[in-house]
Amino acid sequence: IPGIWENGTPYCHGGTFKVVADCLLGRGDKAYETITKILPDADSNPSDESGCEPYVVTNMYFGPDNPRKGETLFAWVTGTAGWMFRAITQYMLGFHPSYNSFTVNPCVPSDWKEVTMTRVFRGDTYKVTVKNESGAQSGVKKLTVDGNAVDGNEVEIFDDGKTHEIIVEM
């Protein structure tokens, strides 16, 4: 059927995988462009056409070749929201957890000069600030944790229940 599923549908769930791939390749501008197309109530998917609440990350919406163009299906039965959260926090903002540590490796649009995120992880609170005066899309020039320089981009988990400040310079 034209304009449904993989046959010409804007597939939001798959779009989140593209965001991750773009970030892994250092393409912050492309990653952000995709996010703006699949976010709820985006210009390409206005809620007054989709029949979906304007705050719901949907699985897909019918493409232009389908008689139901713009309508959405499976708004509440999809992993798209979880993958969107993961794509943004772990890959764009670069807070990627592992067992005893996390890496900080942001991939952001070149016109973002600064972005912040607060993340609670294993009982600790991390306030992450990404500074991008150079207009880079990826790469870490300098990383500090609680004012102390860190070699590389891996941070050991504190496990102390406190708040820690991370500053990333791209």
Regions found by a protein language model. Give the residues of each.
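Non-catalytic C-terminal accessory modules of carbohydrate-active enzymes
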Residues: I1-E6, P10, F17-M170
